[in-house]
């Protein structure tokens, strides 16, 4: 029903979104860009927000689900993805352009150098598809890095109910020392005695799938109860 474009600038993408049957809103931190959009796109009347997307409360604005789209600022790429995770119940999908390295990390699979905290946490809530790479020479002035466009489609994994805080803690701690086996990497978390001989303890965080982390979290929680 709703689409929110983050960081529309002068509306290069906005004009195409406004041709669609969905209701398009924009969030832009730059006041001059908002004034430009208001002047050139009448359909955006009362559908624009001046401010930081990271601080916007989506529930205050949208009565239903809202898809997110944007050419996102590279300096807050990870924060935008974490904001989407936090609001997964209201955000069924996202299509966005990020710095290529961030896009690749988000879509990465186990046993690869790009697989890490971002990969696991995003993929616990969304299916991730790397769509295409955007080269520097299509921008003016060209940036120093390539860009990548990814799509997130909500598909929250089973087993997270009531375990989300512990799940995130295990993932972040495990990857905090990614070259160490989990038996060492997770020492600071007071590992339950029954799990100290668990098969996963002999592996590194990068070897575990998203489902492995969720199952391990469930076993950890059960051992503590």
Regions found by a protein language model. Give the residues of each.
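Catalytic cores of RNA-modifying enzymes
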Residues: 1-169, 173, 215
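C-terminal lobe and adjacent flexible extensions of AdoMet/dcAdoMet transferase-like proteins
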Residues: 154, 171-225
């Amino acid at each position: 029903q709703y689409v929110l474009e983050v960081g529309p600038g002068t509306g290069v993408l906005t004009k195409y979104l406004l041709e669609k049957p969905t209701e398009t809103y924009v969030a832009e931190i730059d006041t001059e860009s908002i004034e430009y959009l208001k002047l050139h796109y009448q359909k955006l009347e009362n559908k624009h927000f001046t401010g930081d997307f990271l601080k916007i409360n989506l529930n205050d604005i949208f009565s239903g689900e809202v898809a997110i789209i944007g050419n996102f600022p590279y300096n807050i790429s990870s924060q935008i993805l974490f904001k989407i995770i936090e609001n997964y119940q209201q955000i069924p999908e996202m299509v966005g352009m990020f710095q290529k390295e961030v896009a690749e990390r988000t879509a990465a699979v186990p046993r690869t150098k790009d697989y890490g905290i971002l990969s696991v946490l995003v993929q616990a809530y969304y299916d991730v598809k790397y769509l295409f790479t955007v080269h520097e020479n299509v921008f003016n002035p060209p940036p120093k890095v390539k860009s990548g466009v990814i799509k997130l489609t909500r598909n929250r994994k089973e087993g997270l109910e009531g375990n989300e805080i512990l799940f995130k803690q295990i993932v972040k701690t495990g990857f905090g020392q990614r070259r160490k086996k989990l038996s060492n990497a997770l020492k600071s978390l007071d590992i339950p005695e029954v799990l100290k001989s668990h098969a996963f303890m002999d592996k590194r965080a990068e070897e575990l799938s998203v489902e492995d982390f969720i199952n391990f979290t469930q076993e950890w929680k059960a051992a503590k109860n």
